[in-house]
């Protein structure tokens, strides 16, 4: 079973803004949340769900689905949007969520920081780069 598809950061924001049932799950590591920043949904009166897909040491979080189900019980009518650094880890998270009955599950293209540019830097695309709400902790 495949996830619902890829959406841009702007489409993710619109979905979250228009559907009060929609959930944003940030699957980056704790270090990324603390040192890079996080999406800010306070303007929508909601919180982001934070669950690591991989641990800081790069090992897969074997409890990901269990932790996800604790925060987002399986329903077939609640859109769940998965965000990582650049839109790669969140694909695996969206696939795992879909297999667990959490659907529709979407991957955010370009993630929070975007892909590397020709100079090896991130930040030219993604949630933060297009000016969507975010904060540093």
Where do the model's predicted regions map?
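Rhodanese-like catalytic fold shared by cysteine-dependent sulfurtransferases
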Residues: 1-23, 30-79, 90-137
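Short, surface-exposed ligand- or partner-binding patches at beta-edge/loop junctions that are enriched
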Residues: 83
